[in-house]
Amino acid sequence: MTKKRVALIFGGNSSEHDVSKRSAQNFYNAIEATDKYEIIVFAIAQNGFFLDTESSKKILALEDEQPIVDAFMKTVDTSDPLARIHALKSAGDFDIFFPVVHGNLGEDGTLQGLFKLLDKPYVGAPLRGHAVSFDKALTKELLTVNGIRNTKYIVVDPESANNWSWDKIVAELGNIVFVKAANQGSSVGISRVTNAEEYTEALSDSFQYDYKVLIEEAVNGARELEVGVIGNDQPLVSEIGAHTVPNQGSGDGWYDYNNKFVDNSAVHFEIPAQLSPEVTKEVKQMALDAYKVLNLRGEARMDFLLDENNVPYLGEPNTLPGFTNMSLFKRLWDYSDINNAKLVDMLIDYGFEDFAQNKKLSYSFVSLGEEKIGKFN
């Protein structure tokens, strides 16, 4: 039987570029372990250009990236308006895209728009699901309207931020808040704030990454929970995982970029999370409800905060969850008796299924014919 050809795309121009490479390595190994697919790899360099497959293989193997990119760019006609994606032609045709591009391009809907334009199946959520979920403010608005509990928040832009002094923030949200760039991932552009000076610095930092910033109340005594969700119309939910960092209970520590991707030796993981049956049921149901409300397909990770009274708050979705050796999403499915090879096989099947389902939708139109314009007085 002819193997389906899977185009694994990784890298990108976000701060999570290197994280994407590590995730892609694990996904590559998992796809290979199924013995069902031929894998073609495409790296997206930090300058936004797709690289040819041979160059991409070297980068996936963690060879020094910059000389590889420099050599490739010498072969590119940058005057070609399609130069950034021209390398996609280098491997012939393929059957499905498997994006592993965290942050910009991969999780904001950009790549999914390209896949749709090329009329190809792909793994994961559609453009609108990614775009809405990547915007923390839009996500919270949808969650709130649909009755899915999340933390209290304020949204500001560079102009309206002047109306929100630290004293006003404290009165509205409390004396510990998190300031977040609305469209960023993996704790980039996020600050924990406890005073006016930190507040000013945090706004300045977040506005480097987006012109829309979320100011969010802190949860007292928070435990952080993660839940994996996979599937389309009838999604599956994983066991719940929990993680804590030193001083998190007092509010001084939190699960930041360093803890996620650089050094999590001080992080305590718990799978399954030790929760009451009632809280476990509520968290899983909230995850499923949010998955559907946000129009997600294929895969996602839902992050929660559990307060000192064991009340869960949905933090945010991650539409292309990390799959590094440090990623809890990967471990959650292992514990849920779905190993890596089975997981990627299911994700690829979901991609084909969603593509076939969308093909049934009608995009027919009625021809306008000859224009007959009314009279103007």
Swiss-Prot record:
Binding site for Mg(2+) 2: 316, 318
Binding site for ATP: 170-225
Functional pathway: Cell wall biogenesis; peptidoglycan biosynthesis
GO molecular function terms noted in the UniProt entry: ATP binding; D-alanine-D-alanine ligase activity; metal ion binding
Gene Ontology cellular-component terms listed: cytosol
Keyword Secreted: no
Cofactor note: Binds 2 magnesium or manganese ions per subunit.
BP GO annotations: cell wall organization; peptidoglycan biosynthetic process; regulation of cell shape
Catalytic activity: 2 D-alanine + ATP = D-alanyl-D-alanine + ADP + phosphate + H(+)
Cofactor(s) this protein requires: Mg(2+); Mn(2+)
A Pfam family hit: Dala_Dala_lig_N
Keyword annotations: ATP-binding, Cell shape, Cell wall biogenesis/degradation, Cytoplasm, Ligase, Magnesium, Manganese, Metal-binding, Nucleotide-binding, Peptidoglycan synthesis
HAMAP family: Dala_Dala_lig (MF_00047)
Function: Cell wall formation.
Name of the protein this chain belongs to: D-alanine--D-alanine ligase
Gene: ddl
